[in-house]
Design a protein with these regions (language model features):
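Short, flexible loop/turn elements at secondary-structure junctions
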Residues: 29-31, 97
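ATPase catalytic-site recognition across NTP-hydrolyzing enzymes
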Residues: 1-29
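Mg2+-dependent endonuclease catalytic cores in nucleic-acid-processing enzymes, primarily RNase H-like
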Residues: 46-176, 197-202, 206-207, 212-213, ...
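Residue-level detector of short, conserved catalytic/binding motifs and their immediate flanks
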Residues: 35, 91, 184
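Acidic, Mg2+-coordinating catalytic module of metal-dependent nucleases/exonucleases
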Residues: 177-203
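Short beta-strand scaffold segments in enzyme catalytic cores
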Residues: 35-40, 188
Length: 226
């Protein structure tokens, strides 16, 4: 799904960002499976930077920490109070719409909005095909050679999981949801709050190691009409 990612341009790091940039927080709740929180800065051109992540994983892939909603909220608030990129900033939170479900009692969103954590969430747009296309649009290289989504190299779980996602064989319009897709979902909610159109002019991705010479750009064959 996102095999177009290349470390030289998609991944980066810096220590500060302008105060007027918007900060977004995406959230995918999990208990037996990992929960995922990602923080994103949006610049004047609409480019998003994933600047920090909190991933509730035991260290075994796709195994959650089994933290309850209030403990997850405490961890999120602690991260925002201790990170200089986030401390004191107004942060817009968008999350899986499922956390607003009140059919079995108080919703996760309501629990996390209470004292002492005061986390406010908006329900994310869960439209899967449109969200997948936003990933493609964001990761494509524009005329300036840069994608519209860049990821700090400290976001290790994004870098580990996102490039490995594959399509669902029974529904090729979507990814296989049996995979470790929690970061994908959390990021998708933020992308859908900041939609962009497909770039009119894109650059091909840089060539990677190709020991079997499978990249057609290496083909030196030329055909002449005679």
């Amino acid at each position: 799904c996102v095999s177009v990612m290349h470390s030289s341009r998609h991944f980066q790091q810096w220590n500060s960002h302008p105060e007027h940039w918007k900060i977004w927080r995406g959230y995918d709740f999990g208990f037996s499976k990992p929960f995922s929180v990602g923080w994103y800065a949006a610049d004047e051109r609409g480019r998003l930077y994933r600047i920090k992540e909190l991933y509730g994983c035991t260290g075994t892939p796709n195994e959650g920490l089994r933290k309850d909603p209030m403990e997850q909220a405490r961890m999120i608030r602690e991260a925002e109070e201790n990170d200089p990129l986030l401390k004191g900033r107004v942060i817009l939170g968008v999350a899986d719409p499922a956390i607003f479900d009140e059919s079995r009692g108080e919703s996760i969103a309501d629990m996390q909005e209470k004292s002492p954590n005061f986390l406010h969430w908006m329900p994310g747009d869960h439209t899967r095909l449109a969200g997948k296309m936003q990933f493609h649009y964001r990761l494509a290289f524009g005329e300036d050679g840069r994608p519209m989504l860049q990821v700090f190299n400290t976001c290790k779980h994004f870098i580990r999981t996102i490039p490995n996602l594959v399509y669902d064989e029974s529904n090729v319009e979507d990814i296989d949801t049996t995979q470790e897709d929690h970061i994908y979902d959390e990021c998708r909610y933020v992308l859908m709050e900041n939609p962009i159109s497909a770039a009119k002019h894109t650059q091909p991705p840089p060539m990677l190691d190709d020991p079997l010479d499978m990249d057609p750009r290496k083909d030196k064959t030329r055909f002449m009409r005679i």
